[in-house]
Amino acid sequence: MLVLRGAPALSEFRTKKLMQSIEALNLPVHALFAEFVHFAQVSAQLEANDQQVLDKLLTYGPKIQEKQHKGLLLLVIPRAGTISPWSSKATDIAHNCGLNNVERLERGCAFYIDADPLNDTQLIQLKNVLHDRMTQSVVSDLQDASILFKHEAPKPLTSIDVLGGGREELVSANVRLGLALAEDEVDYLVSSFEKLGRNPNDIELYMFAQANSEHCRHKIFNADWTIDGQTQPKSLFKMIKNTYEKCPDYVHSAYADNAAVMEGSFAGRFFPQADNNQYRYHHEDIDILMKVETHNHPTAIAPFSGAATGSGGEIRDEGATGRGSKPKAGLVGFSVSNLRIPGFEQPWENDYGKPERIVTAFDIMLNGPLGGAAFNNEFGRPNILGYFRTYEQKVTSFNGEEVRGYHKPIMLAGGLGNIRKQHTQKGEITVGAKLIALGGPAMNIGLGGGAASSMASGESNEDLDFASVQRDNPEMERRCQEVIDKCWQLGENNPIQFIHDVGAGGLSNAFPELVNDGGRGAVFSLRNVPNDEPGMTPLEVWCNESQERYVMSVAPENLATFTDICARERAPFAVVGEATQARHLTLDDSHFNNKPIDMPLDVLLGKAPKMHRDVQSKALTGNAFDVSNIDLDEAALRLLHLPAVAEKTFLITIGDRSVTGLVNRDQMVGPWQIPVADVAVTAAAFDTYQGEAMSLGERTPAALLNYGASARLAVGEALTNIAAADIGDLKRIKLSANWMAAAGHPGEDAGLYEAVKAVGEELCPALGLTIPVGKDSMSMKTQWQDAQGDKAVTSPMSLVITAFGAVKDVRKTLTPELTTKGDTCLMLIDLGAGQNRMGASCLAQVYQQLGDKTPDVDSPELLKGFFLAIQQLVNEKALHAYHDRSDGGLFTTLVEMAFAGNTGLDIKLDALTGDNASALFNEELGAVIQFDADKLNQVDAILAANGLSGVSHVIGTLSDDDQIRFSREGEPVLQNSRGVYRNAWAQTTHHMQRLRDNPECAEQELASKNDLNNPGLHAALSFDVTEDVAAPYIAKGIAPKMAILREQGVNSHVEMAAAFDRAGFASVDVHMSDILAGRVSLSEFQGLVACGGFSYGDVLGAGEGWAKSILFNAMARDEFSAFFERNETFSLGVCNGCQMLSNLKSLIPGAEHWPHFVTNQSERFEARVAMLEVKDSPSIFFKGMQGSKMPIAVSHGEGRAEFAQTTGLEAALDSNTIALQYVDNYGKVTEQYPANPNGSPAGISGLTSKDGRATIMMPHPERVFRTVANSWHPDDWQEDSPWMRMFRNARVYLG
């Protein structure tokens, strides 16, 4: 084993934050220093040249001053017996660089601790701060890392002596293994194995427990019900299915697959042809798939990993729909208990304590969103929708006084995708079909996730809780998705017959489900399962929940095609079994020469006992909420600090929202990028204005007073949100319903039944809405003991609705951005019809009240009329702005619109009934619309035709100053400056950013928000955006070949290909594996573009691993060097491609002054809209664009330009090779955050070679080449945005 020192692992402010965590434990630690250490397992001593390559390979990242090692060494390494995702990717790079004697690379982090002597307890506490016990170990000597390369012998299975010891043996195993089997399931298993005449193996019991857990089987939703002695006619699931029976319109797949499918658009899907890899449009039906999952239990234990794998699992559900499909855009949501942000605690936030095994709500929101965002970012899916609610309060509800809240959080992960009509249904699994596991290896993690998720928090052993959390590797999932994409792109020749994702229960659930759903049995070989921990037992190999895996069946005659696709994408797979005619499951173990599983599928899946719920309903005992003594000024500021109302930028800018180039509406609105959008919208393709929309609705605290109302409000809010998009027919909208409840808690079961009936039997059929997909989580309760005795925090019954719909014209989507042009009116449409019910409102929450009566959907017809009226107004382009009324009421709706429009307001409450507090802060459904004053009659007529005249009120207009005024009958009711409200609204985000990211950047961003003169994003162009300079060359009919270059983990190649295709190029998909295998030569191409993403997951530095696999591979180096030397060629590197090409500068003529790119100053992934200025440089891409200033999408974690020498910046400026610079909204070159999102010196965002043929840039022009793909744009831009000019300039350059 070789030991190689690396760079310092922590920046100054990260070290400071770690020290603060250690000081909070009162440990006598004075200082620490952290450094990466690399370990190489080699098969033979490396020659000098190889050693030099290895040294260079492991030198990466930013320059940080090295320090002397002193103090106690604590070396954090991956858990012994595992192979980390870092290791597998770094080893791949080493092999691609020709280091064949390097068998494996691994990385640790050496902490040198300056401390007084530590006792054993203190040492354990310190180690717990420094490492993640799920995936890491701590040793005290560098040579101890050699355990990383030792392999244990496989461990045998164990059997449970049911035949000899009877039922008690199984009861004991149930507790020991954390199986969560019900009493009747224990009886069923005892009976089944007595009939088989043998004892069950542990693996068989575990497999049964996972497959039949509440998490997987949804036993409560399929149960028979008796409520208050009355037998109920339907199960919960049947009431949900009732919506489909009443309205099956536009639904192509429901309840039968990993996701539901609905009718979408007809447009041109853009992907490469199989025969020559050239991209082209394929005009066909582009149907919409939809799925929303929850990952609550793991997120309470390990927030980053729980949320990351929650998103990853949901993405796999989408990709595994039908015979393979394409995830497109994501959403995420969180409900947690009170944040109690250190230094920003709020008056309503009492601390009721928590058990040790779960983390705090603050920790969940500090790390969980990062996990969800990181997975989506690296996979390459834009995350463009979300919600965030906190609730934790002692209330008097149905069960008397108790604490209700989200100690067990809701972590929502969902999204939409697209699927070919021909692949919507699963195919036939033929007898003899190869049963394949695609994706990463088995590791001993995530055991028992399904069963653990099915228990109330506190019922299981703490070690089992930790064992049930999975770990993520999104770059692997991206490779798998590329394989699935290549399969469905073959159309009728798609080799995938049947596909499922691997989730809860691992292969033990996925493979039996696959063959059972396909009507087959199977014979499997345990030792064919790819395995990174050979020492695992058969149970651990078969049942672990290692992520990024799919199972599928492929006919033997198509296996060669599938194998070739996987090889090109470097996606590992294995044939694990074969499908059989007999519905029997056999698992052979060649190592121990036995059969760990040998049972009929019917025993596993067919006849488990059906649940019966016999429950009682509870009467309400709430008290009215008295608002008469509330100070309105204080109430307004409290509400603006409540997370459900407050600004959520800290949850949004961490997530890529522009990847794919198909995002039309993300959360950020207008020139000031205010996060207030009601709906997320994507375009169906690059050649259409049709698209897809999704929105969220949830009013969970209302369930503490009225279960049915809470459910109806969730549906209503999803509709008032999606109404901002151009949908048309209400039947075009389909819903996902995610149900969370504390089953067994007094009154909650009957309440759940009431809520499901309210939407499934009543509201949705009345509206013509269908719920074709959903999920339930029935153990939303946390129990523990402390010095004060038994404690519990029980979640409200929680329904989260996601609405999905096909969009007719994405350009018509409305936002809350008020226009300040002309004479306009603001109108409130009040679907509560003046009732102003205040129960369970945000105002009640911030005063620690609950109230008695909640808002409700009293008239489905009124809600339907509202939706149709707004749709007509959208279609006729009669409105300037739209914002629904929700958390915080009318006050919040209006101030958010004022923030988006950067304007003051004059609001008159005269037309609104009731007291001022209720008028301002009630959360009845409704919306505020803005329109030209001279269109009042047109608007009135449309509202009247839909039955809304009596609930629609003109309430005011914009003010000429910065004040937001509310008055009644000429008397002031509430008034403050927009600046005061804007600052208050920003505080939650600001404090979370300060504690999570670089505090200096957080301070700079707050200062930017408080700059009331900030002119916002704008465009000042030096050229005519409507001119197509490439048209004369395209007319010649010659399309120069353009290499759209990608490496494993790259995710922005399709939109790049589309941009060059539009400019007249023949865009060709080129994988690095094509070049390394000699299948493709760069001599065929006149242009090359290295695309954005996360090559090799950014191990060994962003883009550096990719570059070094070229520099240190003789064949690849020669290919690229020859290409760059040819005078008639050009090259472009964007984002990850920019990072990569900057590390190839030794091969690129005239690029010697280029920097490389390192971690952003914020030390956070930054997804922003930034202003760029095009400089006067030789770049062929920016000819005629010099002096232009315009917005562009930015999405990267390592974009800060760093020069090797201190004189590097000056040399770059002197050589005129800086092509692009970040400017602020005043148009000045800036290093200030967030206008400069990464802290690059002199605002550097792009550079060129001295002859202009090679250009690199961190921002993403390919994602915004269409005007509709820009988060904000001037009204006069047409189809093409100004960034399209640079691609056309490249075509002009070739002549």
Swiss-Prot record:
PROSITE patterns: GATASE_TYPE_1. GO terms for cellular component: cytoplasm. SMART domains: GATase_5. ATP binds at G306, A307, A308, T309, G310, S311, G312, G313, E314, I315, R316, D317, A677, S886. Its EC number is 6.3.5.3. It is found in: Cytoplasm. Pfam families: AIRS_C, FGAR-AT_linker, FGAR-AT_N, FGAR-AT_PurM_N-like, GATase_5. Pathway: Purine metabolism; IMP biosynthesis via de novo pathway; 5-amino-1-(5-phospho-D-ribosyl)imidazole from N(2)-formyl-N(1)-(5-phospho-D-ribosyl)glycinamide: step 1/2. Mg(2+) binds at D678, E717, N721, D884. GO terms for biological process: 'de novo' IMP biosynthetic process. Phosphoribosylformylglycinamidine synthase involved in the purines biosynthetic pathway. Catalyzes the ATP-dependent conversion of formylglycinamide ribonucleotide (FGAR) and glutamine to yield formylglycinamidine ribonucleotide (FGAM) and glutamate. NCBIfam families: FGAM_synt (TIGR01735), PRK05297.1 (NF003672). This is Phosphoribosylformylglycinamidine synthase. It comes from Pseudoalteromonas atlantica (strain T6c / ATCC BAA-1087).
